[in-house]
Every structure is written in C-alpha cells, then in structure tokens.
Amino acid sequence: APDQANKANNSGSAGVGGNILGMKGGAGMGYTVLTWTRDGVTWHRDRHTDKFFEPDPKVGAWDHAMAWVGSSVVVGDELYLYYAGYRWGHKYQHSVDRQLGLVKVKRDRFVARQAGEKAGTLTTRALTLDAQALTLNVAAMKGEVRVQATTASGEPIPGFRFEDCRPITADALAATVEWKQPLATLRGKPIRLEFSIRNARLFAFEVK
C-alpha cells in the first residue's frame, strides 16, 4: 500500500465452513487474505470479505475448494506466489486431489489506491525526509499521477506543487517523481506528500 509505515505485506490463510457443489455441508473452503504490520510485532489481517486470492469458481477445477498461498520468491520484477490448491474442502477426503500452483504478480503490488476519470487525492501524514529521490510503483498508462509536497499544515511548497510535477503516465515499479526543485532541499523539514491520481493505480512509494 502507498503507506511508508507499513513494514510488510504477507499472505495468510483463512478458512470457512460452507457448501461447495458436490461436497457435503461444512466440508470447508479456503482462500488467501493479506496480513500486515507497522512495527514488525503486531500483525493485522484483512476481513474474510477482502479476499486477496480465491479458488477457481469452475466446478471440478483442481483448485476449486482451496487456494492457500504459502511461500513467495522474488524473481526479477515479479513475485512468484506458490499456493496449495484443493479440489475438495480441507475437511473432505484428506490428501485427495491436492496440487501445488503458481501465480505471478508484479513486485509490491498487493493493494492499490486508484481513481477514475475524476481525480482522487491521497495525503500522507507528516513526514521528515532524509532523501534525494521519490519513486512510485504505479500503473498509469491511461491516466496520470502527480505528487506535491506541502508543509505539515497543508500549504503547497513552491517548486513542489502539482503543477511543478512532471506527470507520470507509465506502468512502472519505480518511476521517479520530478519537480522543478530537487527533493533534497526539503531534507529535515516536516512535510506531507499529496498524490493526485487520475485513471491510474498507485501501489507504493519509496523515498531514498
């Protein structure tokens, strides 16, 4: 998520009792939800309604009942997610029709903030940066993302306003934000970052 405070995004498994076509009631079905932490100690999990990865809805598919992501491996610009797929629920005929699956997603694209033709704005809390560059993980081929820096009280800083920012219109994992002034001039000052998103998705940002 485009929140620098989130230290990690990992997957967790969730299971609920329920009916699946061709199975007895309560056979159990499983899917994957996201968990996250801000301090590396306390973890939170999405609600059951916020599924990250679901079983194949096609009856008879090898992963129709269960799709539990276990391990992940970074391969270049992609994340390989290996998951356990069950044809039947985990309470039904154990060890029958179970296989391993692989899903490939672009790196660090678990969740996003997005907007349509009407631009939306996302504002961070106050930050004190010690950085020379800001990069965005975005999908903005049909729209654009701009960024402006404001004071902690919300006043746009000259040279770092939306109109001073070159629009990002790419599908990129690390698109560099360019203003009329270098980001290093804001070093040590409390600021907020505001993202203007139009027909685009913002997955993450990084300062370095």
Model regions and ranges:
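Carbohydrate-active catalytic/glycan-binding domains of CAZyme proteins
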Residues: 1-208
